[in-house]
Amino acid sequence: HAGHIPDKETGSRAVPIYQTTSYVFKDTEEAAALYNMEVGGHLYSRISNPTVSALEQRIAALEGGASAIACSSGMAAMHLVVTALCSSGDHIVASSKMYGANINLLQHTMPRFGVETDFVNPNDLEAIEKAIKPNTKMIFGEVIGNPGLDIMDVPAVAEICKKNRVPLVLDATFNTPFLMQPFN
């Protein structure tokens, strides 16, 4: 039940599924404030809705994070984080022992947008640190590598990231928040 407060009116523990695509605004000022991202709220279900917000709040609570963004797939999440952190001319240091689709995204798709990646052994801390460049925007790895089940030393890599002021992005698909909370 993490991250969810039961409905005050009904006492329901379950979150209703909101089957709407659009929302009513009090006035044009409220609509303008929402569209300008000056206030929080729902504009259109493709962007957000109360059902997805409940999921995001629960995931954030389980992971120990401040907030979360729900994506339609793991690769959508990966693409979202890469494009949020990187622009043309930027660089990524990534694990060489990870899910093939992640490697394909970084090795074949992102170079078309001017983002280069160096792949390193996730257990070679010296290689990770040496691969960092002035334009490195993230270090990416999997807590438990897919398919080889390689275990990344997350605390050690996090220290390298802190020292170099580079975000550590982790794919935790193979483990649950019960076993690993990367924020901790």
Over which residues does each language-model region extend?
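Conserved PLP-enzyme active-site core in the AAT-like
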Residues: 68-184
